[in-house]
Regions:
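Substrate-binding cleft/loops of secretory-pathway carbohydrate-active enzymes
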Residues: 144-147, 151-152, 234, 302, ...
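Active-site-adjacent "subsite" loops/lids of carbohydrate-active enzymes
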Residues: 35-59, 137-219, 273-277
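Bacterial Sec-dependent N-terminal signal peptides
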Residues: 6-9, 14-38
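Aromatic-lined carbohydrate-binding/catalytic grooves of carbohydrate-active enzymes
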Residues: 74-116
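An active-site-proximal structural segment forming one wall of the substrate-binding cleft
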Residues: 66-74, 124-128, 156-159, 196-232, ...
Length: 457
């Protein structure tokens, strides 16, 4: 009986690791030398739009706040240099420079204009490095414009250049296949698709972003992180380009498009799945995986010392809706999520293509500690399993938008977020410096980080 039970156990273990090419002892992230303590990195995100009034025209403000960042105990900043409207805050010839961004002022949004001519990113690099901080840049990857609420109109590449309309993603809506550029206040009254996404499967789109990354890699950066390197949502992309590539991938024609893939208007996992539904999810994950491979190569071809990574949301159980598998190829997704993952879905996990991941462990104020998704600690614990030691990651909170955080006044909980995340991952990640300034969380962050550092002594 014991021998027979052991055999069954071995078979089960092999099944659960069927996507792994190594299948042996896992590469534990924290290393094999138990006597060596590695000090974990602490990252703070600097959103372009939210912080634009402070930094767009003032190096003094940048120095003021980066000094506070350093004093609070952070090791890294992540500077957003391509906001969701798709223009940039670094030197490149392939898209325009940001001139104005939407900012919250009083009780509404308005535009704030940049009049300075100095290099925005270079200022952060120079000041950050002088303070002993590592400086990373992030870009919103597959975006090309914004249609704003509050009557602000629109801006971005897709609105300036009609010839690029086919770069925009096509949605499988209940009203039919719809290019996002055809959505406006009448047919999208809630402005759900105000941020105009690009089609990740479009070769011209990919080449455009790859050139952006090559130009960005010319800077003396410590790292580059891709944000929104994904599909807009489950309903995208249903363009002719994507259909043709999908048919090539599966080796057959789709007779009834899009219904054989997904019924129009589907916004969540359907109870009855069309013929190609799960294969389509696999295909989208492959598109993103293959682009990540190209993006890494593009960055490293310019400067192979730059750390290459992504920002992702930690909610893996539903992240297939964005077309992203950020897990290890050794993690057999179908064994845990058979309702949406094929047996080949795990082949397109991209963790082993990265040097680092920033993980949005975004949970409410009453869900800091825990063991499952939608707790900060649980998000990080789960990620350890998902990543299988392929890449280090830093998890952390959104302290301005999640439930309980919106109105501030949570200084007592900030140290708990540090403790919960840094001890369950390889670092700490905080979104965003804007909320630290708004709610004056500097001392609370220093307390939390100091508490962690004391455990190393």
């Amino acid at each position: 009986m014991k021998k027979w039970s052991l055999s069954l156990l071995l078979i089960l273990m092999l099944a659960l690791t069927s996507c792994g090419s190594e299948g042996g002892t896992p590469k534990w992230i924290w290393g094999n030398d138990s006597t060596k303590t590695t000090v974990k990195s602490r990252y703070i995100w600097i959103d372009a739009a939210a912080n634009f009034p402070d930094y767009a025209n003032s190096k003094d403000n940048i120095e003021r706040d980066l000094t506070k960042v350093k004093n609070a105990g952070f090791t890294d900043i992540v500077v957003d240099v391509r906001p969701t409207m798709g223009d940039v805050l670094f030197n490149t010839s392939v898209v325009d420079q940001v001139k104005k961004l939407d900012v919250w002022e009083g009780s509404t949004y308005t535009y704030y204009t940049r009049t300075a001519t100095w290099d925005y990113l270079q200022a952060f690099i120079d000041i950050g490095h002088s303070l002993g901080l590592r400086v990373n840049a992030s870009i919103n990857t597959f975006v090309g414009g914004c249609l704003y609420s509050y009557g602000l109109g629109e801006q971005g590449m897709l609105f300036r250049d009609n010839s690029k309309k086919d770069w925009a993603t096509t949605l499988n809506m209940s009203s039919g296949l719809t290019n996002e550029m055809d959505l406006n206040t009448s047919n999208d009254p809630n402005n759900t698709y105000g941020t105009k996404f690009l089609n990740p499967a479009n070769d011209s789109v990919q080449n455009f972003v790859l050139q952006l990354l090559k130009d960005l890699a010319k800077y003396n950066l410590d790292g580059i992180f891709l944000d929104r390197c994904r599909y807009d949502d489950l309903s995208s992309d249903f363009s002719d380009v994507s259909l043709e590539k999908f048919e090539d991938y599966i080796g057959e024609k789709v007779t009834n498009f899009p219904s054989d893939i997904m019924q129009p208007g589907t916004t969540s996992l359907p109870s009855t799945q069309p013929k190609y539904f799960k294969k389509w999810l696999e295909f989208r994950a492959k598109v993103i995986h293959d682009f990540i491979v190209k993006a890494r190569a593009a960055v490293k071809s310019v400067n192979d010392t730059i750390k290459f990574g992504t920002y992702v949301g930690a909610w893996y159980s539903t992240y297939y809706e964005s077309g992203v598998n950020w897990a290890s190829t050794k993690y057999n997704t179908a064994a845990y999520y058979p309702e949406w993952a094929t047996s080949d879905y795990c082949k397109y996990g991209y963790a082993d293509q990265l040097d680092y991941i920033l993980l949005g462990a975004y949970a409410s104020t009453d869900n800091i500690y825990g063991s499952g998704e939608w707790t900060m600690q649980g998000f990080c614990v789960n990620a350890m399993t998902l990543l299988e030691g392929d890449v280090k990651f830093a998890g952390g909170p959104d302290i301005g938008n999640a439930t309980g955080w919106v109105n501030g006044g949570q200084s007592s909980l900030i140290p708990e977020t540090v403790d919960a995340c840094i001890n369950a991952s390889n670092g700490y990640f905080l979104f965003d410096i804007y909320y630290v300034k708004e709610f004056n969380y500097w001392n609370a962050l220093k307390t939390g980080i100091d508490n962690y550092l004391k455990t190393l002594k």
